[in-house]
From Swiss-Prot:
Predominant cellular place of this UniProt entry's protein: cytoplasm
GO cellular component: cytosol
Region annotated Disordered, chain positions: 1-23
Job description of the protein: Member of a network of 50S ribosomal subunit biogenesis factors which assembles along the 30S-50S interface, preventing incorrect 23S rRNA structures from forming. Promotes peptidyl transferase center (PTC) maturation.
Protein origin, superkingdom: Bacteria
Organism whose genome encodes this protein: Aeromonas salmonicida (strain A449)
Record NCBIfam families: PRK05255.1-1 (NF003593)
Subcellular location: Cytoplasm
GO MF annotation: an example: ribosome binding
Database matches in Pfam families: DarP (PF04751)
The organism's taxonomic lineage, starting at the top: Bacteria, Pseudomonadati, Pseudomonadota, Gammaproteobacteria, Aeromonadales
InterPro entries, sorted: DarP (IPR006839), DarP_sf (IPR023153)
Family: Belongs to the DarP family.
GO BP terms: assembly of large subunit precursor of preribosome
Name of the protein described by the UniProt record: Dual-action ribosomal maturation protein DarP
Gene: darP
Length: 181
């Protein structure tokens, strides 16, 4: 009578309940998580995909998934299920770690660019006080060039001209200090 379910009152203790393993719902949730992980891997660029540790069978499945038309075809959904099924028998921790590194790199780059934009705005609005602070942090910058760009950007704003110096200042800062931020 091991395959027949008993009413709850007939169980001796909680250990008998644990013998059945994870519920069907939990198995479906786990499969869905792996399927979403597979979809993330398929959506990566080729250079990012090379950084993910995949065995040959899984790499072939991902490559085929990249060739299918996403979200327009039932075959793509079934293929994602197949990729999820392949990942069930593999250790997915290294794959998840590599994916998180790729995602964090994007957010780190965005944060750097945002800090550059903040410096540019401060230089234009605060003038010399922001310039002195920037120069104290980054000695290799050309103070004279920055002052000239600040004056030109302010003049462009006053005359409602296209922001040529504004953009040029950003490009200069990006070229000189982006890696240092």
């Amino acid at each position: 009578m091991t395959g027949i379910k008993k009413p709850m009152s007939q169980y001796q203790d909680d250990n008998e309940l644990e013998d059945w393993g994870p519920s069907k719902t939990q198995l479906k949730r786990d499969a869905e998580v792996l399927q979403k992980l597979g979809a993330e891997i398929v959506s990566l660029s080729h250079s990012e995909l090379e950084k993910i540790p995949l065995d040959e069978e899984l790499a072939d499945a991902v490559e085929l998934g990249r060739k299918l038309k996403p979200k327009k075809d039932e075959s793509f959904r079934r293929h994602l299920q197949f990729i999820g099924r392949l990942m069930r028998s593999r250790d997915i921790e290294p794959i998840e770690e590599a994916l998180s590194i790729i995602k964090n790199r994007h957010s780190t780059v965005n944060a750097r660019l945002h800090r550059l934009e903040q410096w540019r705005e401060r230089l234009i609005t605060e003038g010399d006080s922001a310039l002195n602070e920037l120069m104290s942090q980054f000695h290799e910058l050309d103070r004279q060039k920055l002052r000239q760009l600040i004056r030109s950007a302010n003049k462009e704003r006053e005359l409602n001209k296209p922001p040529v110096a504004y953009r040029e200042m950003y490009q200069y800062l990006r070229g000189e200090i982006e890696d240092l931020l």
